[in-house]
Amino acid sequence: MSDSNKFKLAGVMGMPIYQSRSPILHNYWLAKYGIKGAYGHFPVELKNLEAAVRGLSALGLAGCNITLPHKVHAMKMMDHIDPLAKRMGAINCIVVQEDGALHGFNNDGYGYIQCVKDAQPDWRADAGPILVLGAGGAARAIVLSLVDEGAKEIRLVNRTISKAQELIAVSYTHLRAHETGRNL
């Protein structure tokens, strides 16, 4: 069977997971472009993450997206990690290679930047302070992508200021942490 005729199975892995709309979106595009495949929810608790990730190849999956709370933990199970994902310290996408090797990527920041550029073609990261809400895995990726785009000042707001300060301490020197709703 040629690769183009092969049924492709993928999904989104996390816990909780059923609130994710990813299967609706991915299955729409699979159908629209006539790609033989399906995309579903994979509810996996942290204690079962390694077994689930290592089982992707054996089950014949093309890969999966990774979401809370697994973005950092799943990195340890990859055979290869994209350089950008290494810098971000988290992955959100696993691709199963033909030889069964697991390749980890992070496209959170790229997706965010592209969305902003699509909505505001004249946008420039260095035009003024940028506000980022949250300090989790996606925020980490977005902040790094903003820095790569030339942002001079990023204001990070999180419910717990210690989490925001933790993100800043990792490597982002031109961030300022703020408690929710204060001195933005």
Regions from the PLM with identified roles:
Residues 148-153:
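Conserved S-adenosyl-L-methionine
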